[in-house]
């Protein structure tokens, strides 16, 4: 078929019209909807996966359920309902996680001044899940409460993870650690020392945003060193984040301020607020 004949055929198809059946409807873009609640109301827990298959792990001690139950429990959401999953071998409070459902990596835990006792071996320990059970693995280098894994940012997979910062900064604890599936190693300190931050991406292409007293910062990590980026409009701390270094979304924050209902989008160059919640 010649190019001129193909052009004639295509234009003729459009002139003849398109046959549509049924009502034409529209759906709001960027809207939130409520789904079934989990069995345990959790606080400061780990969430891994996506909206069709996600696992919730541990609790900070705020759950109405007994601490001995909530802090070792896990639940899986299959896109429609929540159901109980395997228990952890140790209580897991205020830690962080990476990986995916059935290949979970959980690390760190316990904030200083917490109203629940520290659990030896977990505030700088690592737990791995395989879909059937959880087992303990390597220890992180910073072995103190409020270490880099306590409510900081984290990215990666079960065998390649990055733990960034901590809950509240202290000179001896401002570290970034990388896990290679067997051991943890220290990385250069984050320049802005943004504790309680949010982060996403990969071990060699991470983005870290906000933090207590440093909500205005955006920082990039390339696997070796840090670089600063543009200031986000809302300057949040204690939020959550998803996406990649060049296509990220952040939401929430450390208080109930109205603007914490907004989402912020990053395209690799600049930030925009959506005012969708």
Q: How should each PLM-predicted stretch be described?
A:
Residues 1-277:
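Polar, enzyme-active/binding microenvironments
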């Amino acid at each position: 078929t010649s190019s001129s004949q193909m052009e004639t055929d295509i234009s003729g198809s459009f002139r003849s019209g398109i046959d549509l059946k049924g009502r034409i409807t529209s759906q709001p873009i960027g809207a939130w909807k409520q789904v079934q609640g989990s069995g345990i109301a959790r606080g400061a827990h780990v969430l891994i996966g996506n909206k069709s298959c996600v696992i919730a792990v541990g609790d900070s001690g705020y759950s109405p359920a007994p601490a001995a139950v909530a802090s070792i429990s896990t639940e899986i959401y299959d896109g429609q309902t929540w159901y109980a999953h395997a228990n952890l071998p140790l209580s897991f409070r205020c830690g962080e996680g990476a990986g995916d459902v059935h290949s979970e990596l959980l690390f760190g835990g316990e904030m200083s001044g917490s109203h629940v006792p520290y659990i030896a071996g977990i505030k700088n320990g690592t737990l791995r899940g395989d879909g059937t059970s959880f087992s303990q693995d390597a220890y992180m280098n910073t072995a103190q409460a409020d270490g880099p894994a306590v409510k900081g940012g984290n990215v990666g997979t079960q065998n390649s993870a990055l733990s960034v910062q901590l809950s509240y900064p202290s000179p001896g604890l401002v570290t970034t650690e990388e896990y290679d599936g067997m051991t943890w190693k220290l990385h250069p300190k984050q320049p802005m020392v943004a504790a309680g931050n949010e982060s996403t991406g990969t071990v060699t292409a991470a983005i870290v945003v906000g933090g207590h007293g440093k909500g205005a910062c955006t920082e990039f990590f390339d696997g070796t060193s840090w670089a600063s980026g543009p200031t986000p409009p809302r300057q949040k701390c204690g939020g959550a984040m998803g996406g990649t270094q060049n296509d990220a979304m952040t939401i929430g924050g450390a208080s109930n301020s109205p603007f914490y209902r907004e989402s912020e989008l990053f395209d690799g160059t600049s930030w925009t607020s959506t005012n969708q919640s």
